[in-house]
Amino acid sequence: MGVWSVVLYLLNTLIVPFRDERAKFEIERVSAEEAKKIIQMHNSQFVSAIGHSASANALSLLLGVAVPVNRTEVFFNVGDEAIAMALKKRLAEGQVLRTVQELEAVGFDLYYIKRVQ
């Protein structure tokens, strides 16, 4: 029987993909300081699923850890957690934010996500 380990993901979406038929998640808005504490509780070990350099750079500055750009698929298992960055407004079709300043101008919130079932 395999050993399950909890994964902490960094995401730039509130979408929470999973492979099972059903899942339950707890999601709460958090401050940058709270997000830093969560990362510290995981000994700064996380899987980046941040697909855009502006988002990765902003999170690196905000959270005090190096966040690599990594366009990868994520599927939550029970117990997995994430810090998600979500923009405060939808971008125009084809618009890409290329700098931290553009990202900050749009605004974003941070969320803590945990799959509980």
UniProtKB/Swiss-Prot annotation:
Pfam families: STIV_B116-like. InterPro entries: STIV_B116-like, STIV_B116-like_sf. It comes from the Viruses. This is Uncharacterized protein ORF117. It comes from Acidianus two-tailed virus (ATV).
